[in-house]
Amino acid sequence: VEDAAPIFHPMPPGRSGDLWRLSLPGHEESWVVKQPRQHLRVAADWQVSTERAGIEALFLETMAARALTPVPELIGFDPTTRLLVIRHQAAPAWHPWSRLLQSGRIDPGHARTLGLALGRIHAGTRDDPALLERFAAEDLLRDLRIRPLLHVTAGAHPDLAGELELREEELGNGPRTLIHGDPDPSNLLLDGAGTGLLLDGECACRGAPHLDLALAQSHLLLAWAGQPRRAGAWLTAVRTLTDAWRTRMDADGTGMVERATRLLPALLLAAVDGLAPDPGLTAERRGRLRSFARTQLRVAPDRADLLLRRFERAMGDID
């Protein structure tokens, strides 16, 4: 119906922007309209340029053009209003991975899907300086990741400032690829066959690939802290994600996993004392995570399995 008025249905907003589902009378399909906020919805004063909407549009275009990993179809982007429109992937066909994890469905196949997706992006862009220059958004990387995760955490733990500075240096002195920047389980949609769609590319930029891996691992460990009696399933999920990613990175994989392992305690500490602490953590879990992360930052282990076993012991008897 060409002259039908569009209907905007408000969707639950994220902390970084507003969302609407757009439908047209007489049309079965629908679309999602996104608009970023400069002031993120967190208790602290967290401001980030809304130019990141253009980065997300570029990310979606790049993924589709290069067939690196499935993403929602980009319908359009308006650089003036920063409105971005993508095709809506509706339930019951698609589910956020985070919702499946919360329901107790810890499927290593889903972890493998995310690991492979990130690995394909990293391996497929590391030798393309022209593409990486288009994603040279160091200011956004600083405002979205470095400051909230490392700088603010260092301010809360001045005795660990040196260790956190070393983690930041490792992010700056290694290989560069295109990174997603926010590989949260809520940003992976899964269908019944296990096919995944990677969402929310507004944090994408030229950066260190081990940051993506460590972020993905940290989200699983934080979910593990909420379901500690499923330790075996969580261990398998984190290992599967890591191994799937490593297989895509060839000779660089092992060294990057070691870097991710050294960064991981910093990200866990940021979930407690960074700019936007994880609201789902109880006081006891915050205390356990803080103690664990502080100790591991000083030890700086580079063996992922060793760190996971220590995490299991630290979280094992939380009710």
State each model region's role.
Residues 1-10, 255-256, 275-319:
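Regulatory N- and C-terminal appendages and interdomain linkers associated
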Residues 248-259:
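Acidic, serine/threonine- and proline-rich low-complexity regulatory regions
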Residues 64-67, 118, 122-129, 220, ...:
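A general structural signal marking secondary-structure boundaries and capping sites
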Residues 11, 16-130:
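ATP-binding pocket architecture of kinase catalytic cores
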Residues 9-33, 166-211:
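Active-site acidic catalytic loop and adjacent metal/ATP-binding pocket
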